[in-house]
Amino acid sequence: MEDKVNLAEKLALLAAPFQPGIVGRLNDHKLAVVKVQGRFVWHAHDDTDDFFLVLSGRLTIQLRDRDIELSPGELFVVPRGVEHCPKGEGAEVLLIEPEGTPNTGDAGGERTEPERWI
């Protein structure tokens, strides 16, 4: 059996925004926390949905046709294949996605982060 996880302590270990840290595993999915500061990159995940649960701050999930505004305790699931761009000012977010899913989806590039446990 694993130990309990304190998300506030794990978030404190993150030095920079948009660098997710894995905090747990659920079947073949990773649970990760990330800090969101500014705007990320437009991207899509062709093979999986993208789950965002706001822990603190405010997060906007930009879609091509609308913006989804999220406050603490609110979540949104971006359907697979849908282009989106997260942005926020100091938001802290829990992500759930299949292991091996790159944070930048199909966009790739310099903002792609390796999977790492914290």
Outline where the language-model segments fall.
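Short acidic-glycine-tyrosine-enriched beta hairpin
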Residues: 64-81
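A cytosolic small-molecule/anion-sensing beta-strand core signal
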Residues: 27, 55-56, 71-72
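Double-stranded beta-helix
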Residues: 3-11, 24, 89-118
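A short glycine-rich, His/Asp/Glu-containing loop-to-beta-strand
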Residues: 7-42, 48, 100
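Short, conserved beta-strand element in jelly-roll/cupin
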Residues: 35-37, 45-62
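Short acidic/polar mixed-charge low-complexity motifs
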Residues: 29-30, 59, 66, 82
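General beta-strand recognition
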Residues: 32, 41, 60, 69, ...
